[in-house]
Amino acid sequence: MSLSIGIVGLPNVGKSTLFNALTNNDILAANYPFATIEPNTGIVPVPDDRLQILADLYHAQKIIPATVTFVDIAGLVAGASKGEGLGNKFLHNIRECDAIVHVVRAFENSKILRHDEAPIDPKKDIDIINTELILADLQTLEKRLPQLQKEAKANPKARQKVEYLQSLIDNLQKGVPISALSDVDFEAISDLHLLTAKPVIYAFNVDEEGLNNSDLQSQLTELVSPAKTVFVCAKLEEELKGLSENDAKELLESYGVKETGLAKLIHAAYDTLGLQSYLTAGEKEVRAWTIHKGWTAPQAAGIIHSDFERGFIAAQIVDFNDLVAAGSEVKARENGKIRTEGKTYVMQPNDVVEFRFNV
């Protein structure tokens, strides 16, 4: 399964700079509003150190990591849902994304213009974007409702949906995003691609000092709790882009940082969406596959090919750490570390798998 993340934020918060760094891209990231006109898309590999280890173990010809697609749209402004600025035009480009990353400026720099030339105010900025997403969803629902009301005259199920959509409208009008509701019927609204129904990860763009400022991070985390937060320095991420792996690691360590912004964002997205990965390995290739936590072995097999799920017989599974400790698949089997699991087996994050199937 592929994972896609839409990046939103006000103009000049470092959104496009961060996107460039995450995707190793070189799109325009200018110091003025609406540097991003057309939506930009970048597909990036999910960092996973296990893949190279397995590739060395199996002498694999190639490595295929799991991937994430990032979509960067024009900066939103107050009134975007009514056509102000350029952002509203491109909101549809993130409607089918699995999650939203909201980039929030949390650094001072007089050389970089703020969208309204006011002092830095993360809470105000967050409220502006959230309001625009709510208003965009209201427009979607209010456009859909009249059509559904006509259907409801002859269809009892449609009447239930009318009542449900009206309840969503009532909550949105109170400023409550759909994701904050406890009893969301995602199946009923799946065709609407509502923005506030998507999980949101807040990426606070801080300066280098902010990466280790626990007081600042606590204050910012409290603003958006219980949503996931990550703290990135877009400027630093841009510097990392052209460095070798070792040089990048040294630069990160010099700032007391262990992970790149990309790794932080992807880990937060996996956690927020309840995702994990399993591995397949052989001489031809080593590969990571993204699945939902709690999926059974047949469901996981279906990600490779629908025939694998339909004709599932069993899964040969070894824990990654046990495999590495053994030094080879043959040794792992001799040590009794490779086991056979059936249709009810729930996949675990460190599983290295070979599926057996028959169609």
Predicted feature residues:
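Glycine-rich, flexible loop/turn motifs
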Residues: N25-P33, N40-G42, R50-I53, K82, ...
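Amphipathic alpha-helical transducer elements in NTP-driven molecular machines
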Residues: F34, D48-L51, I64-F70, E84-D98, ...
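C-terminal-of-GTPase-core extension/linker across diverse P-loop GTPases
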Residues: S2-V8, V13, F19, Q147-V346, ...
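Conserved G1/Walker A P-loop phosphate-binding module
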Residues: M1-E84, N88-R114, K123
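Generic signal for short, ordered secondary-structure residues
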Residues: S16, P33, T69, I120, ...
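Helix N-terminus capping/helix-initiation residues
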Residues: P47-D48, D121, S244, D319
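Conserved Switch II/interswitch segment of TRAFAC-class P-loop GTPases
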Residues: G42-P47, A74-E84, R95-K157, N171-V184, ...
